[in-house]
Regions:
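Extended polybasic, low-complexity segments that bind anionic RNA or targeting/receptor surfaces
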Residues: 3-150
Length: 150
C-alpha cells in the first residue's frame, strides 16, 4: 500500500498576479543593488572558459558573484545557444532568455545580470504590458456606462 503519487499540488496563478510578483521581485533586486547591466554577453562559440573569465571580471566589482552556489541568473535578450551552453557548465550561474524570467529563478540567485539593457527593457515592457494582461479597457467601459445612464 503506502503513499500514492496521484495528488496534484499544482496551483494556477493568474497573469496579473504573476506580473505583479515579477515586478515586485525586480524592484526589490534593483533597490538592493543586485541587478547588473552588461552591454553584451554574446559568444561566438560555446566556451566555458570565456564565460568564466567574464564572470571573474564582473566579480571584481560585485562580491559574491563568484561564490560556489546560486550566485547569478543571467538574463539574455534572446536565446543564444552558444551563450547558454557556455554558462551551463558553471554550477553557480544560471542563464536563460529574458522572456522566460520568473520570480523563483530571480530569488534563487543573489545577482541578476541583464545583457543588452535596451532590448531588455523592450522585452520586459512587452511581458508586463497591461494589454497582454487583458486589463486596460475596464475604466473606459465603466465611464461609458456611467455616461449612458445619465
Amino acid at each position: 500500500h503506502g503513499p500514492r503519487s496521484d495528488k496534484n499540488y499544482e496551483v494556477k496563478i493568474n497573469r496579473a498576479m504573476r506580473q505583479k510578483a515579477l515586478l515586485v521581485t525586480l524592484s526589490r533586486k534593483y533597490k538592493d543593488g543586485e541587478v547588473i547591466f552588461v552591454d553584451s554577453l554574446e559568444m561566438a562559440a560555446p566556451k566555458t572558459a570565456t564565460a568564466k573569465a567574464m564572470m571573474l571580471a564582473l566579480g571584481k566589482s560585485f562580491s559574491g558573484l563568484n561564490k560556489s552556489k546560486n550566485a547569478a541568473y543571467i538574463a539574455l535578450p534572446s536565446r543564444n545557444a552558444h551563450t547558454l551552453k557556455s554558462f551551463a557548465n558553471m554550477g553557480h550561474v544560471q542563464a536563460g532568455a529574458l522572456a522566460d524570467l520568473n520570480p523563483v529563478s530571480m530569488l534563487e540567485a543573489k545577482y541578476l545580470v541583464i545583457a543588452d539593457p535596451k532590448a531588455a527593457i523592450e522585452t520586459l515592457s512587452k511581458k508586463l504590458s497591461t494589454k497582454a494582461a487583458g486589463g486596460a479597457p475596464a475604466k473606459a467601459t465603466v465611464t461609458k456606462k456611467a455616461a449612458a445612464k445619465k
